Regions:
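Phosphate-group recognition and catalysis centered on beta-loop-alpha active-site segments
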Residues: 1-334
Length: 334
């Protein structure tokens, strides 16, 4: 289990979302190391697989937006169109590359027009494997003299399984080999797909299991299995939906849009059932703030983020994902 139980309700866990991507390209070594130095309780790697079954950290399996793959002529013929979780995407996909091939790529800032300073670090760092991040956090815990956790997000599990890349056993093996499966350091496993969470829990990995919740739509794994009979995400956070999660998961992680909906009772309803509530993602830039909290200037300028975050904090959340860990630590612990 994670150590959220020991943290007061007015002091949620501060989780570095993909490291510290407000300052460095997401999922880069420097992004994670900066997040640890800024005092986060945990960092969040998103996990996808390569053709040869190596687990790497990327927000999605299509990598043209966050790497220089398009600049590699040797990979030009890998560009293709696929349907991932029901959506048609064109680009380059991790499952079409070996780890050795992907290790030749360099990371880029996803949103250079919003985060120009982060983009100045483009081209300097390699893609990381999950094992790399686990080792960075273990070493960082020793260096900084405190327990730091990992919130591992499993991406596109149903899709990868359809390709013969079953993520549950790959993750299980990686965590055990890295010394992260038996509670050595705080671990959360999260996904928008409940099926893979159940599979990992059945394997006996010591972790908190958190069900990710979008503001709209249905989970892809349940949509494949049940069609339109599958519960929507909104139905899942209603009282009856939360009842069905008790005993299966330790909590939920909801889009901040749901908590900014005035009058919602999601946190109170979940807490009444013994479920923790995390939320994602608190960012200070106008591009990501609700309209009422945006300030003057462009999309990359900071708006009245503290006012937005206050609406969320007052609801008693247990964990919050942030892109600027220094701001998150100062606000949510202050």
């Amino acid at each position: 289990m994670f150590y959220a139980e020991s943290v007061p309700r007015n002091s949620p866990l501060v989780i570095g979302h993909r490291g510290a991507p407000g300052y460095r390209p997401e999922h880069s070594r420097s992004s994670y190391e900066l997040a640890l130095a800024m005092g986060v309780d945990a960092v969040e790697p998103d996990v996808v697989a390569t053709k040869d079954g190596v687990l790497i950290v990327r927000h999605e399996n299509e990598i043209s937006g966050t790497t220089d793959v398009a600049d590699h002529p040797e990979f030009a013929d890998r560009k293709t169109t696929k349907r991932v979780d029901g959506d048609a995407l064109t680009g380059w996909f991790t499952e079409d590359f070996t780890w050795a091939e992907l290790s030749t790529l360099r990371i880029r800032e996803r949103l250079p027009e919003v985060r120009a300073s982060s983009a100045s670090f483009d081209g300097a760092q390699q893609i990381l494997r999950l094992r790399d991040v686990l080792d960075i956090v273990r070493e960082g815990s020793t260096e900084h003299g405190r327990e730091i956790g990992v919130v591992l997000e499993v991406k596109h599990a149903t899709y990868f399984a359809s390709l013969g890349l079953d993520l549950a056993p790959l993750i299980d093996q990686e965590l055990r080999e890295a010394g992260w499966a038996a509670g050595e350091l705080p671990l959360v496993i999260e996904s928008f797909e409940s099926t893979v969470l159940g599979q990992l829990r059945e394997r006996g990995i010591s972790a908190s299991y958190i069900y990710l919740i979008e503001a709209s739509g249905r989970p892809y794994d349940l949509l494949v299995a049940e069609g339109k009979r599958a519960l929507t995400y909104k139905e899942t956070v209603a009282p009856k939906g939360l009842d069905a999660l008790v005993g299966r998961f330790d909590g939920i992680s909801v889009s901040k849009k749901m908590l900014l909906d005035r009058g919602n009772t999601i946190v109170a309803d979940a807490h009444a059932r013994g479920l923790q509530v995390f939320t994602w993602t608190c960012r200070p830039e106008n591009a990501f703030l609700a309209a009422e909290f945006r300030g003057a200037g462009g999309r990359g300028e900071f708006g009245d983020y503290e006012a937005e975050w206050s609406v969320i904090a007052r609801q008693g959340i247990d964990g919050v994902f942030v892109d600027h860990p220094d701001l998150g630590v100062a606000f949510f612990r202050g």
